[in-house]
Amino acid sequence: MSDEEVEHVEEEYEEEEEAQEEAPPPPAEVHEVHEEVHEVHEPEEVQEEEKPRPKLTAPKIPEGEKVDFDDIQKKRQNKDLMELQALIDSHFEARKKEEEELVALKERIEKRRAERAEQQRIRAEKERERQNRLAEEKARREEEEAKRRAEDDLKKKKALSSMGANYSSYLAKADQKRGKKQTAREMKKKVLAERRKPLNIDHLSEDKLRDKAKELWDALYQLEIDKFEYGEKLKRQKYDIINLRSRIDQAQKHSKKAGTTPKGKVGGRWK
């Protein structure tokens, strides 16, 4: 056999030995091992059961000293009373402090109220003085204006009296103008009085009042319509006047450039 074959045989032999060592033992051997372990643990259980238990005994009170339960209870009651008294004292102190704070707050409120009333009084007095001053200034201005008007009227009268006969015609024209204004004002009042009829509704029933209200509403609605129509008509007329004026201005500009005199208003008359 060569050296390589010898080495191969030795390796196979070694592998078989390793496999035998790693294989588990037979069942009989395993059972014996468990029995040995069980036998080893049994003495420990016996020892635990045989351990003696300690005996419990009541504490002994020294024979030389006696315990006074009444004294202990009295001390406890005194301690509770002291704590209760301390709580009562702290409560009354807090109550007293709150009352003092409340009194101080009321005093501050009253003081602030008095200060506010004084400020309002001073403000009202200043406002009254200001109103009086304004009234005095207004009266003074009115007096000065009346005096100035009187002086102007006197100057006008003197100037007119110096004109002689023309003064009477001037007064007549002035009276005529005043008469026209007065007549127009009276006519306006008359027309308004005719249109504004008295409203007698005290004797009307509910249905008639409803009809009257509807009638007034219709009249008011018609007046609003007329007002709107007149306003639109006035706008159109103003627009037409503006257009006419612009056309006249344009015509005058062209005529000036051409050197001709257009037909227009001269001396208050149209040519």
UniProtKB/Swiss-Prot annotation:
GO terms for biological process: regulation of striated muscle contraction; skeletal muscle contraction. The modification Phosphoserine is found at S2, S90, S161, S168, S169, S205. One of its GO terms (molecular function) is troponin C binding. Residues 29-53, 62-74, 113-155, 183-192 have a biased composition (Basic and acidic residues). InterPro entries: TNNT, Troponin, Troponin_sf. It comes from Sus scrofa. Troponin T is the tropomyosin-binding subunit of troponin, the thin filament regulatory complex which confers calcium-sensitivity to striated muscle actomyosin ATPase activity. Belongs to the troponin T family. Residues 1-21 have a biased composition (Acidic residues). Residues 1-74, 113-192, 249-271 are annotated as: Disordered. Keywords: Acetylation, Muscle protein, Phosphoprotein. GO terms for cellular component: troponin complex. The modification Phosphotyrosine is found at Y221. This is Troponin T, fast skeletal muscle. The gene is TNNT3. It comes from the Eukaryota. The modification N-acetylserine is found at S2.
